[in-house]
Each structure stands twice: as structure tokens, then as C-alpha cells.
Amino acid sequence: MNRKTFLKNSSLAVGALTTIPLQSLIKNKEFISKRPPVYERTFTSSAVEEIIKKIKTVIKDEEVSWLFENCYPNTLDTTVDFEYIDGKPDTFIITGDIDAMWLRDSTAQVWPYLPLINEDEKLQKLVKGLINRQTKCILLDPYANAFYKD
């Protein structure tokens, strides 16, 4: 092999190795939950916790199972501000990197939980609170698409 071919092949090999994440080369990975502790979660749902347990038994790939466990409940764990205002549920969902709620995105973020609302009264109230909040926002400014909580 001549020097030019050697350098070309070596460069390609090094380039290929740099595109492979180091963790993918490690065989014995531990998939530890990255969810916040229960006391730090912004909202909890027994139906969501049950579906996570159920789905994890069906997913054979340990990493995909871990991803599902961490990603599916993320909206509830980290972005929900639920309270009662004048005796009615009110749900504000942070939908981006600032503490604001986009109407379209807040709807999209609760969409995966809709099949579970018949099983969990807390989820029903969360969705009702979101509808109440979105109604207030639209009445405040029908042309805006994002709102702060205040």
C-alpha cells in the first residue's frame, strides 16, 4: 500500500470513529431514570405511571424502553402548572424555552395522554384546566398564539 492510500484510509477510519458516540461502544450500559424525583414533578398521573409499566414490559430493547420511560411523562413531570382559580381547574403548560404557553403546542403536549383520561380523574382535570386557560387566553387576545401565565 502506498503512503497516499494509507493516509486516505486512515483518515476515513478516524472520521468514522468520531461519528460513533463513545457510549454506543460500551456493552454494559445502565439505563437509570432521568425523571425528576416524585416530589419535584409538576404533575403526576397514576394512569400514566401504569401505562409506563405496561409498555416497558412490551418493549424488548432496554434502551428504547428507557427512552419511553423518560420521554412519555416529560410534559407532566416538568412543564405543568396546575391550580384551581375561582373553583375551576386551570392548567398552564410551559411549551418552550421561556415560561410561556403556545396554544397549539400546549394542546400537542397533552395529546398523548388523552386516551388515558377516562382512567384518571386528575388527567381529566388537567385537560379541563387547559381548555379553561386557553379559553381565557383567546378571549384576552384572539390573534396571539402565546401567553405568559400572568
Language model segments and positions:
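C-terminal segment of N-terminal export signals and the immediately downstream linker at the start
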Residues: M1, I20-K54
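Well-ordered alpha-helical scaffold segments within catalytic/enzyme domains
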Residues: A47-I59, A108-E121
